[in-house]
């Protein structure tokens, strides 16, 4: 039965629509149901918060409403050692909440600010104990004080500040030059002291042969080339010419014949020999023997 009753109900539009600069509120009337209906059928209030481009268009950040957890934003000056994790642990909030409130994309965006917004509970212990947390200044409560100096005083102050900056700059340059000169003098003195204590090394001996030419002069090289290229070949040709012209075609050879004639004989490779005829002489013994034989 309960399910059938819910199906028979028709959609009921909002009776009242309230518009605000940052949100829209829709008011619904109670239906003619039983007293035991759920809280969904009761009147409720819907608050839509701007997101994305609408938040940037509004220009002014509105703190959360009291019904959304009673959270307020307090401002804290950043120190050099602060980080998102440290702030979250110190004030009992989430890192995501701090990044969301301050529009951080990365954790490094924290170091670009001088102060950060911390979401804390309204009327909580943190608001009473932590004195470094300060409430945010609204644009209406901020007061700007502008002090205008006369033109002469302003010009004098500007020139005095510029002169002081220039003097400090030039003094720094002079100090750097003095330090460089002193360090150079110290290095020069230490080098001179080191070289004075070291013994002088003997000069290396010069080698007589230098390079591929063995240390000879250019005219010596020219003379050697002429001797090898011209004189030796000419001497070689002349020597073989003389040897070829000195040999005779035939050699004479002479032998002695016993009957007193002379004969010439040629033997290849030997000098010619001459043979002279010698008359035969018989001794007295041979004649005596011949006469005795005839008398007998």
From Swiss-Prot:
One GO CC annotation: membrane
Positions of glycan attachment: 30
Region listing for Disordered, in residue ranges: 29-67
Residues in LysM domain copies: 74-118
SMART domains according to UniProt: LysM
Ranges per topology, Cytoplasmic: 239-296
Superkingdom in the source lineage: Eukaryota
Keywords attached to this entry: Glycoprotein, Membrane, Transmembrane, Transmembrane helix
Biased composition (Basic residues): 46-59
Subcellular location: Membrane
Record field: transmembrane: 218-238
Statement: the UniProt record of this protein carries the keyword Lipid biosynthesis: no
Statement: the UniProt record of this protein carries the keyword Transmembrane: yes
Extracellular side: 1-217
Main location: membrane
Mode of membrane association: Single-pass membrane protein
Listed name of the protein: LysM and putative peptidoglycan-binding domain-containing protein 4
Organism encoding this protein: Homo sapiens (Human)
């Amino acid at each position: 039965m309960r399910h059938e009753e819910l199906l028979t109900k028709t959609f009921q539009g909002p009776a009242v629509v309230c518009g605000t600069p940052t949100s829209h509120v829709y008011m619904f009337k109670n239906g003619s149901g039983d007293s035991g209906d759920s809280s969904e059928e009761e009147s409720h209030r819907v608050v839509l918060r701007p997101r994305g481009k609408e938040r940037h268009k509004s220009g002014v950040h509105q703190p959360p409403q009291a019904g959304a957890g009673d959270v307020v934003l307090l401002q804290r000056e950043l120190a050099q050692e602060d980080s998102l994790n440290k702030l979250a642990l110190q004030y009992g909030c989430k890192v995501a909440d701090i990044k969301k409130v301050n529009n951080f994309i990365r954790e490094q965006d924290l170091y670009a600010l001088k102060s950060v917004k911390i979401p804390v509970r309204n009327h909580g212990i943190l608001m009473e104990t932590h004195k470094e947390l300060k409430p945010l200044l609204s644009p209406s409560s901020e007061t700007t004080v502008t002090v205008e100096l006369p033109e002469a005083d302003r010009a004098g102050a500007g020139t005095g500040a510029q002169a002081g900056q220039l003097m400090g700059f030039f003094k720094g340059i002079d100090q750097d030059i003095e330090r460089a000169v002193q360090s150079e003098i110290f290095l020069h003195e230490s080098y001179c002291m080191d070289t004075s204590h070291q013994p002088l090394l003997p000069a290396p001996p010069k080698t007589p042969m230098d390079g591929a030419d063995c240390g000879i002069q250019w005219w010596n090289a020219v003379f050697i080339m002429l001797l090898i290229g011209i004189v030796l070949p000419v001497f070689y040709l002349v020597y073989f010419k003389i040897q070829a012209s000195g040999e005779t075609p035939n050699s004479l050879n002479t032998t002695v014949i016993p009957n007193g004639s002379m004969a010439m004989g040629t033997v290849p490779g030997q000098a010619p020999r001459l043979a002279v005829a010698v008359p035969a002489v018989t001794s007295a013994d041979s004649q005596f023997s011949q006469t005795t034989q005839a008398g007998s």
